[in-house]
């Protein structure tokens, strides 16, 4: 927050927020590892006196394309290009994960190979997804020098256009599918990760998927699924761009995003 928003806060402000948003009917306690029935009884007793009031009314997010530029005395520019993605409960969430991985999920990804390795236009480039309950984002980050910024952004956009024309190569889809499944399985070997996974799933989706169901969902994603999703997502009229460092003019970025 800012000084202006923090100054008026009192202890009652925080207590009221707790009562409104931290309600027992909205609480999930996830437990993994070695535990007993007595442990579960203790947890239930511990939370039995938790109180809340009212009903959470959360306004659905309304995405608006935007351009954000901030001058900062740093050695490189940081760019984040984002598009509306899919939610945590969308049928397309597995295809979205694979799309993100193919484009910018590591050193063998399209953007890393094209923008960094083959053309040397950036220090780093990768993609990431930000799924929420009712919406989501697919974002592309790159860190680079101001002198290569235009070329890099233009190349990134051309790579997206090419992908929307032809979709993924069979070996790309196969590699990223296996990476996603392997990462999932290895993550569940850690009891802490398993606890977070089941808790988040139950809280946000109201169910915990079996690992076999998740693996099968990845196996059922086709190249056409990813291509159709990419064509829906990479709509330049819906693109948002944030630049921190020594940004160019707004007109320059708007022209590139046309």
Where do the PLM segments sit?
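Charge-rich, well-structured scaffold segments of protease-associated domains
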Residues: 1-54, 87, 117-258
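His/Glu-based metal-binding/catalytic segments typifying zinc-dependent metallopeptidases
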Residues: 55-110, 247
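Short amphipathic alpha-helix segments
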Residues: 110-118
């Amino acid at each position: 927050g800012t000084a202006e928003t923090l100054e008026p806060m009192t202890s009652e402000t925080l207590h009221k927020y707790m009562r409104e948003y931290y309600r027992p009917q909205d609480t999930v306690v996830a437990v993994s590892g070695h535990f007993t029935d007595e442990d579960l009884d203790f947890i239930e007793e511990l939370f039995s006196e938790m109180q809340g009031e009212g009903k959470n009314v959360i306004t659905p997010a309304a995405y608006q394309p935007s351009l954000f530029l901030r001058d900062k005395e740093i050695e490189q520019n940081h760019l984040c290009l984002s598009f509306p993605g899919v939610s945590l409960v969308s049928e397309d969430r597995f295809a979205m994960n694979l799309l993100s991985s193919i484009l910018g999920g590591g050193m063998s990804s399209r953007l890393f190979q094209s923008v960094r390795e083959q053309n040397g236009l950036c220090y780093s480039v990768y993609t990431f997804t930000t799924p929420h309950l009712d919406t989501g984002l697919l974002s592309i980050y790159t860190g680079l020098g101001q002198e290569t910024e235009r070329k890099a952004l233009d190349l990134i956009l051309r790579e997206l256009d090419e992908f929307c024309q032809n979709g993924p190569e069979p070996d790309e889809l196969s590699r990223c599918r296996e990476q996603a499944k392997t990462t999932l399985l290895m993550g569940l070997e850690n009891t802490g990760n398993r606890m977070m996974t089941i808790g988040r799933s139950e809280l946000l989706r109201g169910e915990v998927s079996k690992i076999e169901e998740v693996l099968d969902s990845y196996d059922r994603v086709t190249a056409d699924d990813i291509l159709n999703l990419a064509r829906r997502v990479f709509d330049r009229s819906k693109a948002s761009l944030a630049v921190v460092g020594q940004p160019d003019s707004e007109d320059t970025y708007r022209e590139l995003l046309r």
